[in-house]
Swiss-Prot record:
Gene: mdm34
Quaternary structure and partners: Component of the ER-mitochondria encounter structure (ERMES) or MDM complex, composed of mmm1, mdm10, mdm12 and mdm34.
Biased composition (Polar residues): 303-332, 346-357, 386-402, 444-460
GO-annotated biological processes: mitochondrial genome maintenance; mitochondrion organization; mitochondrion-endoplasmic reticulum membrane tethering; phospholipid transport
One GO term describing the cellular component: ERMES complex
Name the record gives this protein: Mitochondrial distribution and morphology protein 34
Biological function: Component of the ERMES/MDM complex, which serves as a molecular tether to connect the endoplasmic reticulum (ER) and mitochondria. Components of this complex are involved in the control of mitochondrial shape and protein biogenesis, and function in nonvesicular lipid trafficking between the ER and mitochondria. Mdm34 is required for the interaction of the ER-resident membrane protein mmm1 and the outer mitochondrial membrane-resident beta-barrel protein mdm10.
SMP-LTD domain location: 1-195
Entry's family note: Belongs to the MDM34 family.
Membrane topology classification: Multi-pass membrane protein
Compartment annotation: Mitochondrion outer membrane
Amino acid sequence: MAFNFNWSPLTADAEFYQRAQEMLTAALNKSPKPPIIKDDILVNELNLGSVPPDLEILEIGDLAEDRFRGIFKMCYSGDAFLTLKTRVQANPLNNHLFSKPSFTSPQPLAADAGLTIPLQITLSEIKLSAFIIVVFSKQKGLTLVFRNDPLESLKVSSTFDSIPFIKDYLQKEIEQQLRTLMMDELPAIIHRLSLRLWCPEYRGKEDQEMAEAVKKTKDEVAIDPFASPPQDAVDARGNVLDASEISNLSLDGGSEIHSLFSQKNLLRLAALTNSHRTLSLFTPSIRDAVFRAWAPSERGDSAGTTTPATTSLHRPQSSLGGQSTTYTFSNRSSDDGHGSMPSRPSLVNMNSATTGLSLGANRGSRSHTTRKKKNRVVNLRKSKTTDNVSESGESETASITAASEPIVQSRIPEEPEDIPVTPPPGKVRFNSIDLGDSPKKLQPSRSITPEQGNMNQIPTLTVEPSTPIHSENQKRPAYNQSSFTSYTSEKSATTPPHTQFSYPHGLHFSATESPSGILEQAWIMKMASELARRRHDKTAREGFWSTSSNGDDAPPAYEPKAL
């Protein structure tokens, strides 16, 4: 199928060119411009040339007298060109120094002032190749859609062709902007131009809108900046102007009108400039002026100082289950010694049978946001030996449970705080411990469930200890004689009749069964039994704690007290 494509009416219509230039100018200034461009982009000249594009019909979807729809392959390599004019900033350093104080830049500085120069760009040798969808109707005009990027290449000629890197920069930027323009703005421009050519009603409406815009521009009243001049106006040389001289000035009066400032404000500005130059803290007050300053929080460059934080108590929940609660402490005071020494933490609440005691520094506490938090381990006992309680600052949370057995209702006395407890080497085995019944007056003050209150029997513990604990010059606190069992006849000669048993400090017993902690329970029960046997053995043999123990003797046998 063949058709006639007449290009000459477009090239001969002057009104068409004028309207096309206006639309292209509006489209080029719609998108954000680079900061180097300081003025609007004006389309100075537009010429479509004498060579029309080559069109190849690929598909025809609809064909009638007043409408047409088809897909074409377009190729263009003609003599069309486009000339643009604008003003650019030839001194990029001025943009950088615009927001900086004048006293921070070296004086004099040749590149301190702004320099804008005119720029003329000519786009020629445009080569296009694309698949287009054309829909034509006399009522709706011509609609053209590019299915791919049509721009293949073009030549950019500008005022800065003698500078290679500026030429390459302009070539790259203009190609990128032109691709966006052709895909987004060019179809809309072609559609409006087609409506103007084939739709008389659209042309009349557009002419009416343009006439109203011109009339509105003429009716605008210019604002006279000299209607309310300052009271003490001065000229460029600092001479005071009277009212008659001010009235003679006009908007077209020359360069002197730009020097009409208040004399007092000029003096204040000079004082402010001197303060900046000399780094003085004096700031003169100027009316109708706003002083901007950065607060330390906005600048982010000042790390505020805070007073030393005191020790705080935290209440973490136990990780072993239940609702057991312990109080731990964290020393967050600084190194200068202003922090206060915390008191020894004690067990406050026991809401379940599983209770943990933590003596380590709390790692959940947060210090100042700009300084690294300091966790310290505080030894609360006055050490009399060279042994240390712990180097890590964290004590193990002891929890002992016995399956299907009642809870031990006996009070656990604490050892004096000035006696450190250290584990010596050695390993001892023994069979069992019978603790007997605990008197009611020695029971701890805590809530007991009805199931625990109905049980009166004491569990028998069979353990294998691993690391016993020793202490010097420490007498074991005693319970009543009736609440504990005595040794058998083979040890009765060397055992005091009123020697009684107490649990080691820091161990707590419960009857709650935990399936995941059976191994831990067995180990702690072994350790408790070994500690009890060693303390009783050494007290009966030597009367004080010894630092050496071979642990070869078999443990004595225990038997329950006759009821």
